[in-house]
Amino acid sequence: MSKITKLFKSSGGSGSSSKNRKGPSAQEALFKLRETEEMLTKKQEYLEKKIELELATAKKHGTKNKRAALQALKKKKRLEKQLAQIDGTLSTIEFQREALENSHTNTEVLKNMGYAAKAMKAAHENMDLEKIDDLMQDIHEQQDVAQEISDAISRPVGFGDEFDEDELLEELEELEQEDLNSQMANVNLPSVPSSKLPSTKLPSRPASSRKKVEDDDDMQMLAAWAT
């Protein structure tokens, strides 16, 4: 067997083993990403302190030692470049971590929904739609029977069923009319005098006085009729 054949066989075997091997879980990947974020955050804080230190060095030397001041500023620029790269890397890792967290959340949600669907299916396996319809029909019938029983119990027995209310009202009106006619018949009107009174001419009264006398006479007649 040649070395080339052995190489292809070994590579094929490693390929099959790599296919059988599963990738990292979502929890493992998230753990690694958080570790990387923590490491880069510490590096970020270190670079920020170094930049402040180099800036202070450049200010310290100023015009007195331009060479040292320029050297400090060059270091500061290199550190700022590294800091910018770390900021970009952190943004990428943060985006990847959030996407992985969302993917893991969606996976768990779908898994739980699948469990719920299976449980619902298992619960409905022993249910027959025809039996459910029959059961609901029986329930409605029993509710109707219960309502009829309640109506029968709450209905008064022996009161109001054998009498017509309209006839009773008509009879009551007749009684009231008879009572009113009896009262009108018993009214004592004043008797008319049989002898003629002497025709003495009374002085004429003013129109207002005659009107007042007529009103008083009407009131007296009305009072006598009422008694």
Curated annotation (Swiss-Prot):
It is a peripheral membrane protein. Signal peptide: none annotated. GO terms for cellular component: cytoplasmic side of plasma membrane; cytosol; ESCRT III complex; late endosome membrane; multivesicular body. Residues 189-206 have a biased composition (Low complexity). It is found in: Cytoplasm, Cytosol; Late endosome membrane. Residues 1-27, 178-227 are annotated as: Disordered. GO terms for biological process: late endosome to vacuole transport via multivesicular body sorting pathway; midbody abscission; mitotic cytokinesis checkpoint signaling; negative regulation of cytokinesis; protein transport; vesicle budding from membrane. Keywords: Coiled coil, Cytoplasm, Endosome, Membrane, Protein transport, Transport. The keyword Protein transport applies. The keyword Mitochondrion does not apply. Residues 32-94, 129-187 form a coiled coil. Belongs to the SNF7 family. Probable core component of the endosomal sorting required for transport complex III (ESCRT-III). ESCRT-III components are thought to multimerize to form a flat lattice on the perimeter membrane of the endosome. Probable core component of the endosomal sorting required for transport complex III (ESCRT-III) which is involved in multivesicular bodies (MVBs) formation and sorting of endosomal cargo proteins into MVBs. MVBs contain intraluminal vesicles (ILVs) that are generated by invagination and scission from the limiting membrane of the endosome and mostly are delivered to lysosomes enabling degradation of membrane proteins, such as stimulated growth factor receptors, lysosomal enzymes and lipids. PANTHER family: CHARGED MULTIVESICULAR BODY PROTEIN, CHARGED MULTIVESICULAR BODY PROTEIN 4C. This is Charged multivesicular body protein 4c. The gene is chmp4c.
